[in-house]
């Protein structure tokens, strides 16, 4: 029979020995596919994966403004175009509706633009209101008022411009006030309205009387995006009046084009006539109506 000390020693050895782990039951792999499946990654050459993006394709840059082939396009004589446009404007006040010509040019995008003034045989605008930038309290200010300027001066005129008050649709600047105009910093307000005086447009002058005489009855035009637009008549104009205005306008544009450098090609591609509320009618350089029953005199009466 074992003694008491031997029993205690054997118990001590059992308490100090490493406990054995319970054996995990064996689980079939098909019951745990996420554990059993091995995760394998492969390198890829696809640039779209991993957040990479393809570089956008560069758009083709064209040197010339877009043009269209007029072969087969329906075009109208002046009287036919007036006939259809007058029908669209039935019920509109004759004095509020204008005929407008759009001259499409074949021209480079980065080339010089056509910009000038022309005096039409039959004026379209009769509400020319001119303001003059000139020294305050000077004889020039008095001269401008006597010539019919709606406003004249320097700081008073600049303050009206900054406040958005534009009681004029033409603006001149005398050469003595050219420095004051630059310091006033009003170009951002006048430029978008086409009112900023400049030597190129002959609106900076030292002869107010001659400039007033030239501006009254003259209309300005400017090429924008390869097109020159200008009002050439009121709805009450006769076909002959409208034809003469268009003839003078086109002759002036061709003269301006002829003055440009030969290295900057520019030519008239299409002429379109429209009205305030009407569509654009491509003209074919003919005058008479195609309908024998219609005469130009029939388009002279008030609608």
Swiss-Prot record:
The keyword Ribosomal protein applies. It comes from the Eukaryota. GO terms for molecular function: structural constituent of ribosome. It holds the Pfam family Ribosomal_L1. Belongs to the universal ribosomal protein uL1 family. Component of the mitochondrial ribosome (mitoribosome), a dedicated translation machinery responsible for the synthesis of mitochondrial genome-encoded proteins, including at least some of the essential transmembrane subunits of the mitochondrial respiratory chain. The mitoribosomes are attached to the mitochondrial inner membrane and translation products are cotranslationally integrated into the membrane. This is Large ribosomal subunit protein uL1m. It comes from Neurospora crassa (strain ATCC 24698 / 74-OR23-1A / CBS 708.71 / DSM 1257 / FGSC 987).
């Amino acid at each position: 029979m074992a003694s008491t000390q031997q029993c205690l020693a054997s118990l001590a050895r059992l308490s100090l020995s490493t406990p054995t782990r319970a054996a995990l039951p064996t689980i079939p792999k098909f019951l745990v596919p996420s554990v059993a499946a091995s995760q394998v990654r492969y390198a890829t050459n696809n640039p779209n994966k991993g957040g990479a993006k393809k570089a956008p394709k560069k758009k083709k840059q064209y040197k010339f403004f877009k043009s269209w082939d007029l072969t087969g396009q329906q075009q109208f004589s002046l009287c036919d175009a007036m006939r259809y446009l007058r029908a669209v404007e039935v019920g509109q006040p004759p004095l509020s509706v204008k005929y407008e010509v759009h001259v499409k040019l074949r021209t480079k995008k980065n080339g010089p633009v056509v910009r000038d003034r022309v005096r039409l045989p039959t004026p379209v605008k009769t509400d020319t209101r001119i303001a003059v930038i000139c020294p305050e309290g000077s004889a020039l200010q008095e001269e401008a008022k006597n010539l019919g300027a709606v406003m004249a001066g320097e700081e008073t005129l600049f303050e009206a411009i900054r406040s958005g008050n534009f009681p004029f649709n033409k603006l001149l600047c005398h050469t003595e006030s050219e420095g004051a105009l630059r310091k006033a910093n009003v170009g951002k307000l006048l430029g978008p309205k086409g009112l900023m005086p400049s030597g190129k447009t002959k609106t900076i002058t030292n002869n107010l009387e001659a400039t007033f005489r030239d501006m009254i009855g003259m209309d300005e035009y400017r090429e924008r995006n390869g097109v020159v637009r200008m009002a050439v008549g009121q709805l009450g104009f006769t076909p002959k009046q409208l034809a003469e205005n268009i003839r003078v306008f086109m002759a002036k544009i061709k003269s301006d084009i002829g003055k440009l450098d030969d290295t900057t090609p520019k030519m008239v591609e299409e002429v379109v006539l429209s009205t305030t509320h009407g569509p654009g009618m491509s003209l074919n350089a003919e005058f008479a109506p195609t309908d024998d029953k219609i005469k130009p005199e029939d388009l002279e009466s008030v609608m």
